[in-house]
């Protein structure tokens, strides 16, 4: 079986994983504390499909809720946050799919500079505040209270520090540094919690999704059929990915990515082939 990557970061695709029923375009993936896998897809069927780590289908939920599923993220306390791009909303769910909170006005874009206009991802910081990348309709990042109240927004359209061309993903590390994948500008910008620019990483291909593990290792899903693995200091430790339709290859661009507690990597692609793959670390 072919191995992708090298050194400490070698992977083999798990062929046939999931036997996914009625899969739509897969925009995102996340795992809970038990390594159950939540596949977020655009389909007339339920938007969230749940599997165990071996690929056994467990349940589904979310039918009739979402207009355009985009980002999904699960906190260490097993709270699920989703972004619905075309509905301009962030939603919080329990693991069983109970809706706990909606932030934003369904079907209505926020005023310029205000939440939300086609948001892309929502996550929690260590202190429990919500960060949202926003998104396709405007070039902003929002920091909210745990209840959804606006604390701070920053960003504008452009290519300079603190400017964005499609902020496609937000992630916050344990020291409250905020990582924004600035997809249209082919970079990751890093800020403090007050929105002050710290630094940026370039040399990225249309970055889509960023995951920080408990070991402080970063995985980035990129356009151009690539996954980049980095340290928090920006040192690249591995890159892998091939174009194609064979198992382990990417026919388009990895769009969603998550790493479970064992180091296995799940990657989704938003393409007509409805591709979703698991890569086991070896």
Specify the residue positions occupied by each region the protein language model found:
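Eukaryotic scaffold repeat domains enriched in small/polar residues
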Residues: 1-282
């Amino acid at each position: 079986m072919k191995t992708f990557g090298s050194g400490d970061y070698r992977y083999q695709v798990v062929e046939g994983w999931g036997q996914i029923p009625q899969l739509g375009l897969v925009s995102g993936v996340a795992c809970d504390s038990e390594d159950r896998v939540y596949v977020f897809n655009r389909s007339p069927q339920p938007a969230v499909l749940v599997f165990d780590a071996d690929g056994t289908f467990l349940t589904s939920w979310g039918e009739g809720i979402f207009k355009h599923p985009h980002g999904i993220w699960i906190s260490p306390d097993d709270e699920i946050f989703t972004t619905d791009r075309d509905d301009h909303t962030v939603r919080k769910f329990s693991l069983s799919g109970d809706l706990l909170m909606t932030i934003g006005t369904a079907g209505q874009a926020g005023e310029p500079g205000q939440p939300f206009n086609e948001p892309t991802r929502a996550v929690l910081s260590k202190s429990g505040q919500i960060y949202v990348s926003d998104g396709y309709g405007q070039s902003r990042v929002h920091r909210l209270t745990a209840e959804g109240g606006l604390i701070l927004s920053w960003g504008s359209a452009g290519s300079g520090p603190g400017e964005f061309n499609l902020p496609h993903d937000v992630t916050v590390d344990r020291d409250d540094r905020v990582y924004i994948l600035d997809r249209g500008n082919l970079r990751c910008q890093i800020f403090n919690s007050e929105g002050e620019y710290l630094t940026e990483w370039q040399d990225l291909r249309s970055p889509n999704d960023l995951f920080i593990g408990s070991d402080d290792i970063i995985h980035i899903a990129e356009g151009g059929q690539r996954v980049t693995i980095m340290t928090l200091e920006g040192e690249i430790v591995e890159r892998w990915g091939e174009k194609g339709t064979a198992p382990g290859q990417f026919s388009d661009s990895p769009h969603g990515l998550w790493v479970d507690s064992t180091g296995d990597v799940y990657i989704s692609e938003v393409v007509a082939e409805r591709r979703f793959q698991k890569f086991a670390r070896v």
